Amino acid sequence: MAPLSKALSVFMLMGITYAFNYDQPYRGQYHFSPQKNWMNDPNGLLYHNGTYHLFFQYNPGGIEWGNISWGHAISEDLTHWEEKPVALLARGFGSDVTEMYFSGSAVADVNNTSGFGKDGKTPLVAMYTSYYPVAQTLPSGQTVQEDQQSQSIAYSLDDGLTWTTYDAANPVIPNPPSPYEAEYQNFRDPFVFWHDESQKWVVVTSIAELHKLAIYTSDNLKDWKLVSEFGPYNAQGGVWECPGLVKLPLDSGNSTKWVITSGLNPGGPPGTVGSGTQYFVGEFDGTTFTPDADTVYPGNSTANWMDWGPDFYAAAGYNGLSLNDHVHIGWMNNWQYGANIPTYPWRSAMAIPRHMALKTIGSKATLVQQPQEAWSSISNKRPIYSRTFKTLSEGSTNTTTTGETFKVDLSFSAKSKASTFAIALRASANFTEQTLVGYDFAKQQIFLDRTHSGDVSFDETFASVYHGPLTPDSTGVVKLSIFVDRSSVEVFGGQGETTLTAQIFPSSDAVHARLASTGGTTEDVRADIYKIASTWN
C-alpha cells in the first residue's frame, strides 16, 4: 500500500477504501503500533522472501486485553510497516470465544518436514499457545480443561497472509511434562527454531509458575519429544514466560554461544515495578542448555537484564536471519500499568528492533544490542544541534528546541568532577516538565528520570527513576545514544551492553532540551541531536 502524506495510509476493509491517520497524541512516529485496539507480545517473528513478518498479541474488539488473536504487520526494512488482516482470529470471536491464540513463534519449513506444503509452496508454520477458557472436546478428539494452556500449530501457504489451524491433531503438546501436569494453566509461549547441527526442530516453552523452561525436539513440527528442562535460576520474582533460545556470534569472530531470554512478570529489574526480561549465556547441544558459570547468580533476584528500564518485555527473536544479523523486538509496555496508558484508539507499541550479538566485557560474554532501523531513510546525517565543551561548568546550558522525535548522541569523560551529568529532554519551556537521561559518576550508572515527564497520573508507580550499570570504555569515555519518540525514550549505553527503555507522555509543546552538570564540571562533552522523521509519512 502506497504511503500518503500527512501520516495517512489507505486501506481496504470490506470493499471500502478509507484513510487512517497516525498523527494522534503520543502515537510513535518510528515505532510500530497497530491502527487501533490492544497489542502486547511480539509473536511469530520471521524473515522470509525479503519480508519481515511481525505478528503480535491483539484484541480485535477493543483497547483492553481480551479476545486474544494474532495481529500481523510486514516490513522490508524493520522501519516502514504495513498492517495486514488479523492472522489468527480468536475462535468464536463475536460470540462465545472457545480458544484464544496466546504467544508463540513461526518458521519457514523449507524442506516441508511437516507435509503441509503443496504445489511447491513452502509452508510457514506457527506454533502458539492455545488458551481454552472453557472445558471442551476439540475437533481432534482431545479434551481440555477450563483455562488450560497447550501448544498448537497452524500453517500458511500464501506467505503468512492466511492461516489454517491443524485441527486434526491440535494441540500437538497438550500438557506440561511429568511431573508438572498440575501446571496446565501456566504452560505457554513456545519458541521454535531449526537446529542445524542435530537436524531437528527445537521448541522451548515455559512452565511459568515454576520458573522452568521445557525443551522439546521434533522431526516434523507435529510430534514432539521432551529432551530437557532449564531453571529455576536467577530472577524468580514472578512467572517466567515468553522464552527464547538463539545462537549468537561472540566478539565478531568465528566463535559462538547460545542465549536464553525469559520474560519475568512481575519482578523486573531493580527499581522497576512489573515486568522485565532476563538472559542467560551458555552452550546448547541440541537437547540441553548449560549456562556459563558467570551467568548464574546465587539467590533468586539477581539477573542479567536485557533492558534495565520498565518498558521492555516479551522480547522475541527473528527466525530466518543469518547468525550475524540476529534481531529481537520487545513489547514497549509494562503489565503494571499497560492497560491504563493514555493513548487512543490504540494501546501499546513495539520497541525499536535491536541487533543482537555477544561481546566479552570484563572477561564475561555479554549481550550487546544496537538499534536496527533504516535510519538513513528517516534521519539526516547533519545534526540539528552540535556542541562540544572541553569543560562544562556546573549548571545548565542554553535551551535548544528538538521537536518530538529525535536522536541524541552524548559522550563525556568518566574522570569528570561532577556527581551527575544529564540531558533534559521533551521539556516544557520552563523545564517544569522534562525527562532526564544522564550518568552518575560515582555509581557508574545510567539513569532515566520520568518523575516530571508529563502525564504520570494513571499509575502511582509510573513517576520513577531507573538505573542501569555502565562502565566507561577503555579510553575513559562514557557514550550514550538516546532515541526519543512522541511517547518513549530508549537509551543505548556504551557498546549496547546497557539499555533502558521507558514510556513517557509529555505535552505536545514539550520540545525543549538542555545539558546539565551537577556537583562539579563535566569534561570533554560532545552532544549531537538528529531529527528523526515519521515512518508513516
Swiss-Prot record:
Activity under varying temperature: Optimum temperature is 60 degrees Celsius.
SUPFAM superfamilies, sorted: Arabinanase/levansucrase/invertase, Concanavalin A-like lectins/glucanases
Keywords of the record: Carbohydrate metabolism, Glycoprotein, Glycosidase, Hydrolase, Polysaccharide degradation, Secreted, Signal
Keyword Signal attributed: yes
GO biological process: polysaccharide catabolic process; sucrose catabolic process
Pfam families: Glyco_hydro_32C (PF08244), Glyco_hydro_32N (PF00251)
Active site positions: 41, 241
Location(s), subcellular: Secreted
Taxonomy, superkingdom: Eukaryota
Biotech / industrial applications: Two major applications of exo-inulinases in industry can be improved with the increase in thermostability by the G388A mutation, namely the production of high-fructose syrup from inulin-containing plants and feed additives.
A Gene Ontology molecular function term of the record: fructan beta-fructosidase activity
Cleaved signal peptide residues: 1-19
UniProt cross-references to InterPro entries, sorted A to Z: ConA-like_dom_sf, Glyco_hydro_32, Glyco_hydro_32_AS, Glyco_hydro_32_C, Glyco_hydro_32_N, Glyco_hydro_beta-prop_sf
Sugar-bearing residue positions: 49, 67, 111-112, 254, 300, 398, 430
Top-tier EC class: hydrolase
UniProt record similarity statement: Belongs to the glycosyl hydrolase 32 family.
Name by which UniProt lists this protein: Extracellular exo-inulinase
UniProt source species: Aspergillus awamori
Native organism taxonomy: Eukaryota, Fungi, Dikarya, Ascomycota, Pezizomycotina
